[in-house]
Swiss-Prot record:
This is Polyribonucleotide nucleotidyltransferase. It is found in: Cytoplasm. Its main location: cytoplasm. Residues 557-616 form the KH domain. Its cofactor is Mg(2+). It comes from Persephonella marina (strain DSM 14350 / EX-H1). Belongs to the polyribonucleotide nucleotidyltransferase family. Mg(2+) binds at residues 490, 496.
Length: 709
């Protein structure tokens, strides 16, 4: 860094598995509450934190917004497309924004309702280190040095396993060869967030990876403490509103017993209706100032949450009557609609996902710009939609939310390790999950429905994939782990822990918590309970559909793969692409060729694909004795004419074979450019053919007629 003028730079540095990571501040974005740059290798991420002076009124959540952007200048590129500037967030940027948000959010104290805005930008990106985990560290560090009551620090790292050894913050090249790729975030004392995928590894290996990552997380937390000791501001405290406390005390004394009774109602709608009635009755009995009416609703929700938690922790019976480890009833249907290539409905209690699979041809891949590869093609896509009617809400649908994009990515990651490679199954695959009904764990219903839908489509997956969402209620040392959580248990609980995989191991994992950490013992117990539940669901899925359908839908595109001699590829293409254009125009297919002799034909129906295959086979076939062909005259001499039967394959039509009558010169009957129908009467040892015009009988069809139509 070069320039003029005096600046003050505060910088701290540590090593993660011998790779330096540094955090610096002091000379940029000084009007924000806190700003840092985090570096690893030549990758650098800038993060700024701004906190509003006033709190929002009448809300019961932290108004935290995270915006992460990857600038193309960071890796020396100009944005593609017509508009040469960055636009709305990409899917990758949305996913990383969520990755930053989730470990940061639980670190703020209850009752803090000031707006918190985190802005992260990748300023430099090398071809080694992913900036996403650096952005987590940067967000925590930027908040930690501000006056905000942030109870961190937290740090995030990525852990992979290569040749049986764990690696923290690996390079892209190492990640591509590993069988685990998980982002872990935590404090010095506990794990806060887990997000990632693996190739059917055991729960024990996943737990070992998380704990291994935590040791490096501790170093990065110490690094942030060192930075705060140099530049940190005095933290503000969250003041308790005495009027809110009065309303809470009076309201709770009135509603407690009635709410406890309401939780004996097992039906969700009826239960929620009764809980609402209790509130309407209670507010008539206490004094609530007009400016506190909305806040009273927030306070009541908190009371209801606490009563539900107490009931489940004490009685070990959930609000729908289930035991903590009990899964709701499941029903499955496949092959629902004839025009869809593959379809399934997966229903678990009041959660229902309709999942459709569509098969496409090359060229229909999703193209995305990425830091790692520049332009990346996605052959397998999974999209998740959460319409308002699924929860009974009367509002119009909108564009996919960050949550929908995140849930789709989680399910896609769970299924992807089981998708056959392109050599085995040369289709582009798009899976769409429509949530028809929601009462918890829709992303895991999507995983189950997607696996069934792919089987129904005939995609040759070797195994089913299932997912389960686990929850947690914890008060001091007392806790209960919940299997297959409801929506209320998700909203009112302390953890949302999703695990997906096959009978042989985990393929995807995601954990979000609302408390300040999770111990090894609870994490281990949750993984074991999730495995048991997954096996139960997989048994039902295999019962419904034991294996992929042997045939694709008749409405799916037809793909034919051929192997030809590499020297035949130019013949298929023809001069200036003449031959391949003719095949495409006549059949409507797509054709992919490579120099190794691989030919792929893609068509909307089997008839078109078969016709294209036949045309290619005729084009590259060897000349056969006794067969009739059409050919173009390329040269004429007195003794005969040279006729091209196939591209580059000349035959001799001797003057004596032109007509039953005797003629002196071939030039009397034939000229260059004539199209003739001839029969092969001889092939010598060198493969040279002799043909006859006079031996052709009426009704004989030329084998290569299509070339001349």
């Amino acid at each position: 860094m070069e320039g003029i003028g005096d600046i003050t730079v505060e910088k701290v540095e540590t090593k993660i598995q011998e790779t330096p990571i540094s955090i610096e501040t002091g000379y940029f974005a000084k009007q924000s509450n806190g700003a840092v740059i985090v570096r690893q290798g030549e990758t650098a991420v800038f993060v700024a934190a701004v906190i509003s002076e006033e709190a929002q009124a009448d809300i019961d959540f932290l108004p935290l917004t995270v915006d992460y952007r990857e600038k193309t200048y960071a890796y020396g590129k100009i944005p593609g497309g017509f508009v040469k500037r960055e636009g709305k967030p990409t899917v990758r940027e949305i996913l990383v924004s969520r990755l930053i948000d989730r470990p940061i959010r639980p670190m703020f104290p209850k009752g803090f309702f000031n707006d918190v805005i985190i802005t992260a930008m990748t300023l430099s990106a090398d071809d080694k280190y992913d900036p996403d985990v650096l952005a987590i560290v940067g967000a925590s560090a930027a908040l930690h040095i501000t006056e905000a009551p942030f109870e961190g620090p937290v740090a995030g790292v990525r852990v992979c396993r290569l040749d049986g050894e764990f690696i923290v913050n690996p390079t892209y090249e190492q990640r591509n060869r590993s069988d685990i790729d998980i982002v872990v975030a935590g404090t010095k004392d506990a794990i806060v967030m887990v997000e990632g995928g693996s190739e059917e590894v055991s729960e024990e290996v996943i737990l070992d990876a998380i704990l291994f990552a935590h040791e490096e997380i501790k170093k990065l937390c110490d690094l942030q403490e060192e930075l705060r000791s140099k530049v940190g501001k005095e933290k503000i405290t969250v003041e308790i509103d005495e009027e809110d406390e009065r309303i809470k005390a009076e309201l709770e004394s009135i509603v407690r017993e009635s709410v406890k009774e309401a939780f004996n109602i097992l039906d969700k709608k009826e239960r929620n209706k009764r809980i609402k009635e209790i509130y309407e009755e209670a507010i008539q009995k206490i004094e609530i100032p007009e400016e506190k009416e909305k806040k009273a609703e927030v306070i009541y929700k908190e009371i209801v949450s606490n009563i539900m938690r107490e009931k489940v922790l004490k009685e070990k019976v959930r609000i729908d009557g289930r035991r903590p480890d009990e899964i709701r009833p499941i029903w499955i249907r496949t092959g629902l609609f004839p025009r869809i290539h593959g379809s399934a409905i997966f229903t678990r209690g009041q959660t229902q996902a309709f999942v459709a699979t569509t098969l496409g041809a090359p060229g229909e891949e999703q193209i995305e710009e990425s830091i790692e590869e520049g332009e990346e093609k996605k052959r397998f896509m999974l999209h998740y939609n959460f319409p308002p009617f699924s929860t009974g809400e009367a509002r119009p649908p909108r564009a996919p939310s960050r949550r929908e994009i995140g849930h789709g990515n989680l399910a896609e990651r769970a299924i992807e390790p089981l998708i056959p490679d392109e050599e085995e199954f040369p289709y582009v695959i798009r899976v769409v999950s429509e949530i028809l009904e929601s009462n918890g764990s829709t992303s895991m219903a999507t995983v189950c429905g997607a696996s069934l839908s792919l089987f129904d489509a005939g995609v040759p997956m070797k195994k089913h994939v299932a997912g389960i969402a686990m929850g947690l209620l914890k008060e001091d040392d007392d806790y209960v782990i919940l299997t297959d959580i409801l929506g209320d248990e998700d909203h009112l609980g302390d953890m949302d822990f999703k695990v997906a995989g096959t009978r042989d191991g985990v393929t995807s994992i995601q954990m979000d918590i609302k408390i300040k950490g999770l111990s090894k013992e609870i994490l281990q117990e949750a993984l074991e309970q999730a495995k048991k539940a997954r096996m139960h669901i997989l048994d039902l899925m295999y019962k419904a559909m034991p294996q992929p359908r042997p045939e694709l839908s008749p409405h799916a595109p037809k793909v034919i793969t051929m192997r030809v001699l590499p020297e035949k590829i130019p013949v298929i293409i023809g001069p200036s692409g003449k031959n391949i254009k003719k095949i495409i125009d006549e059949t409507g297919v797509k054709i992919d060729l490579d120099q190794e002799g691989l030919v792929r034909i893609y068509a909307v129906d089997g008839e078109s694909a078969d016709k294209a295959k036949e045309m290619i086979e005729r084009l590259i076939m060897d000349i056969e004795l006794g067969e009739v062909y059409m050919g173009k005259v390329t040269r004429v001499e007195d003794y005969g004419a040279f006729v091209e039967l196939m591209p580059g394959k000349l035959s001799l039509l001797h003057v004596s074979q032109i007509s039953p009558e005797r003629i002196r010169s071939a030039k009397e009957k034939i000229k260059v450019g004539d199209i003739l129908t001839v029969k092969v009467i001889d092939i010598d040892e060198m493969g040279r053919a002799k043909v006859s015009l006079k031996e052709v009988r009426e009704g004989e069809e030329p084998k290569n007629k299509f070339l001349f139509e």
